[in-house]
């Protein structure tokens, strides 16, 4: 109850306080040669010479991690500096550095703050112990409220919403409801505001499976899952995707659930895949595709001249596999079938699995508003897909899933 009360106060503070800054949510595995993302961070911070404070608080090897980030930012014109506030950094006094007035002043004078990857619990436990902001965290908020940038990759992205996964297991564990406060989930730092839930490594690791139950449990209607080596630049209500891939926008404003079913279920979710260069307004719901998409092919299943290109009608046996959810959405948009289905389940149930037979069928289907764009201008087969509808239905799987065929 105390946790929920504190969370409510944090949410009210976020909702009633205007934040002028830009949050850059990076999906992890950010490569050194990703010019679009590194350059954008420096640009948003003010350009050449911009002072940027780098926190490798989450990292297993903070000095190495901070050094790589500082070097990448400085190659793009920044004046970045590591702030030695990390539980796993050797030969420092963590509490002394955390409360050092000179370090706090240096952070407050920065134009941007960058959080490294690693273990996100180290960030919140260090900067916001027991839910109370430290002076160092207040300095970071001062940067953000002054129109500066807070960027973070992987663990540094996880802390961007008011709630976050702390040390979650796999997707199936969360889908099956086996998660606890302070273990698998916790409060984040809230830089993207109170109404948007974010997650990272999203398509690579099939994290739609954990985002949906989390959003329902935490009361979110909007979620944004950012893919690896990709960033979502969140400025007020505007979101722009930059980098290598895209992000999945989840809208549960029209979604319902059947309380009679003894497991997680969902009907009427809306999924939109925003590709690199796409922009989306979280308030109006309007998406503006990248310029090269607008010059290419629009796909509207409701149009009289709709001619689907994809001929295969696949059933996806692991809908939570690497990028499979987006592949299924593209097949729905540009295929003949009115729906596309897939399964989420454990082929080999774990010894401590309380529901080894429980699986989930994901049903994507066409409905009003489904539209998209395709382009090969950047050398791939790139789709933008808006408003694919999704149901998640609990099912009973066979254990084992199959048995060898016996000889006659």
PLM regions: where:
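Catalytic-core regions built around general acid/base machinery
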Residues: 102-106, 132-147
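Glycine/threonine-rich flexible loop motifs
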Residues: 120-133
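Structural recognition of the beta-strand scaffold that forms the well-ordered cores
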Residues: 24-25, 51-56, 81-84, 112-116, ...
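Catalytic nucleophile loop
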Residues: 114-117, 139-165
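Positively charged n-region of N-terminal signal peptides that target proteins for export
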Residues: 1-6
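Substrate-binding cleft of extracellular glycoside hydrolase catalytic domains
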Residues: 62-123
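C-terminal and late-domain segments of enzyme folds
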Residues: 20-48, 59, 63-67, 73-78, ...
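Bacterial N-terminal signal peptides
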Residues: 7-17
